[in-house]
């Protein structure tokens, strides 16, 4: 199966798909799958755009809305993870993954799927140590703080991915694992990015949780982005503890596999040593001319005619189900179970057992991922909103997606967004239905099931009745526009600064008409920085 890997998409879907079409034409081959390593920017409209954590002068609607509205259709199955420049409100509606547009699938906070038998895992976001131990407490409309923390990696997703057994063919992340540069051409990397040297020396370049995942999961391929350069590495694994297992055979216990290895150690002592398992790591650039942003690989897969088979991963579904009680939506730190739990007899190994895998068949008769995408909000209108960069638009309120509602209902897990809203005394909105101003999409799902709310036992909260009035809610909505300061999420680079050195044109204040009375009170402008002669960013 031919798979195209994209670094940072930055909303340039048309250019990416055009590049794939050129490759197919020149090589006379068909690309079966596109994987994107973050900064996808699935902005459906101007409200989504306000939740993206970038300074206002860099906000760009790009082209995703065309695929969301149905004006364009993705020519190849596309799977992506989130980065640090996303329509966070939309992705937060799909914590366990789902379709953001026809033929475009988001993996969720973390996820595992199978395409033609190729097992693909991924984790969204970037690592920031001060948020890693927190729960998923954010919900829209965001504050200046939560607009950024919402895409920071949390310990729960890393913990869940560590429970996987068997072979992982491909792993996707936005960040690089810490220390990955030691396994490639470090000198060449520093010639391209000399400002990486300080972070390398301090151990700050990359994500430490991803380094742990790399050692635990040991995938055949690991693809990343974020640092806007191409870099390859070969990572050997001396201790291959992950025993390959078939989905559903139940032989996934790490303890049993380790004991069997020790039993066979003496009998195989005279045999030649086994080849050391190696992970092939590749980071790619962002979608710009003359940049290495796309790579095509040919990976062995099941021979299937027609469209690729796209399925849930049985082991991952069981892990989600068995760790549902570990979800936290609190802002304070909390800790997950581990081996050193003292006298508390709490389960810490959630690698699925044979019985747990067998019980999954009662809930999922088929692992095929349903094509149940629905448009739930109006898409951007380029004719009516052509001057959008000078418009004042507020953030949207929280929405519940019918895909997540159905998934949570069938699997018996909680939607973290629902929990966060309830924990903060908010009323749950109704599950979004098919957008009324657009035609239904062929193959879309039937009307969503009734909203599944978390049980009182799960929440373990005693919440007062909401005290926010309608007037207060309206006032809050007026203040939902936030002006984000610059934040160094990425290492500063000369080429990045050059590519982003674009300022908004000045906006002149229009004087009142002559008939206006001279005594009109002058009001203070909201978002005054938009009207300044010079930008501070």
UniProtKB/Swiss-Prot annotation:
Keywords: Hydrolase, Iron, Manganese, Metal-binding, mRNA processing, Nucleus, Zinc. Active in presence of diverse metals including Fe(2+), Zn(2+), Mn(2+). Binds two metal cations in two adjacent alpha and beta metal-binding pockets. InterPro entries: Calcineurin-like_PHP_ApaH, DBR1_C, Dbr1_N, Metallo-depent_PP-like. GO terms for molecular function: metal ion binding; RNA lariat debranching enzyme activity. Residues 242-272, 473-537 are annotated as: Disordered. Its cofactor is Fe(2+); Zn(2+); Mn(2+). It is an enzyme of class 3 (hydrolase). It is found in: Nucleus. Binds 2 divalent metal cations per subunit. Gene3D superfamilies: 3.60.21.10. Pfam families: DBR1, Metallophos. SMART domains: DBR1. Residues 124-154 are annotated as: Lariat recognition loop. Residues 251-260 have a biased composition (Low complexity). GO terms for cellular component: nucleus. GO terms for biological process: mRNA splicing, via spliceosome; RNA splicing, via transesterification reactions. The keyword Repeat does not apply. Its EC number is 3.1.4.-. It comes from the Eukaryota. A divalent metal cation 1 binds at residues 8, 10, 228. A divalent metal cation 2 binds at residues 39, 84, 174, 226. Cleaves the 2'-5' phosphodiester linkage at the branch point of lariat intron pre-mRNAs after splicing and converts them into linear molecules that are subsequently degraded. It thereby facilitates ribonucleotide turnover. This is Lariat debranching enzyme.
């Amino acid at each position: 199966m031919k798979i195209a890997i994209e670094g940072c998409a930055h909303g340039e879907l048309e250019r990416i798909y055009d590049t794939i079409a050129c490759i197919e034409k020149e090589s006379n081959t068909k690309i079966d799958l596109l994987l994107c390593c973050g900064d996808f920017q699935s902005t459906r409209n101007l409200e989504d755009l306000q939740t993206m954590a970038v300074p206002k002068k860099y906000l760009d609607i790009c082209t995703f809305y065309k695929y969301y509205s149905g004006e364009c259709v993705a020519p190849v199955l596309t799977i992506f993870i989130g980065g640090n420049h996303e329509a966070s409100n939309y992705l937060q509606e799909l914590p366990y993954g789902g379709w953001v547009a026809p033929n475009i699938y988001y993996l969720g906070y973390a996820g595992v799927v199978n395409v033609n038998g190729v097992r693909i895992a991924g984790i969204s976001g970037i690592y920031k140590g001060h948020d890693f131990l927190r729960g998923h407490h954010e919900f829209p409309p965001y504050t200046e703080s939560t607009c950024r923390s919402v895409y920071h990696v949390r310990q729960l997703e890393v913990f869940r991915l560590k429970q996987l057994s068997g072979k992982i063919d491909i792993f996707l992340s936005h960040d690089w694992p810490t220390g990955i540069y030691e396994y490639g051409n470090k000198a060449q990397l520093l010639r391209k990015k000399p400002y990486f040297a300080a972070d390398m020396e301090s151990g700050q370049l990359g994500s430490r949780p991803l380094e742990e995942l790399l050692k635990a999961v040991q995938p055949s391929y690991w693809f990343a982005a974020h640092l806007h350069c191409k870099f390859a590495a070969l990572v050997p694994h001396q201790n291959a503890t992950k025993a390959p297992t078939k989905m559903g055979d139940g032989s996934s216990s790490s303890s049993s596999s380790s004991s069997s290895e020790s039993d066979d150690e003496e009998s195989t002592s005279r045999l030649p040593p086994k080849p050391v398992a190696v992970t092939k790591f590749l980071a790619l650039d962002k979608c710009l001319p003359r940049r290495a942003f796309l790579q095509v690989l040919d990976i062995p897969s099941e021979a299937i005619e027609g469209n690729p088979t796209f399925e849930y991963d049985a082991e991952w579904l069981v892990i989600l189900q068995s760790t549902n009680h570990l979800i936290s939506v609190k802002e304070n730190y909390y800790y997950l179970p581990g081996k050193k739990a003292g006298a508390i007899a709490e389960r810490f190994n959630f690698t699925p057992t044979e019985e747990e895998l067998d019980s999954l068949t009662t809930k999922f008769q088929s692992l095929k991922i349903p094509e149940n995408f629905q448009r739930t909000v109006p898409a951007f209108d380029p004719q009516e909103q052509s001057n959008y960069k000078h418009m004042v638009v507020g953030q949207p309120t929280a929405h519940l997606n019918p895909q997540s509602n159905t998934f949570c209902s069938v699997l018996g897990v909680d939607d973290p967004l629902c929990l966060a809203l309830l924990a903060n005394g908010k009323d749950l909105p109704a599950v979004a239905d098919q957008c009324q101003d657009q035609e239904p999409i062929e193959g879309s799902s039937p009307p969503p099931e009734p909203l599944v709310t978390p049980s009182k036992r799960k929440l373990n909260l005693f919440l007062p009745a909401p005290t926010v009035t309608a007037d207060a809610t309206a006032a809050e909505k007026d203040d939902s526009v936030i002006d984000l300061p610059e934040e160094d999420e990425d290492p500063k680079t000369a080429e990045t600064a050059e590519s982003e050195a674009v300022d908004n044109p000045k906006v002149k204040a229009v004087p009142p008409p002559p008939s206006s009375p001279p005594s009109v009170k002058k009001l203070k402008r909201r978002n005054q920085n938009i009207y300044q002669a010079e930008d501070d960013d």
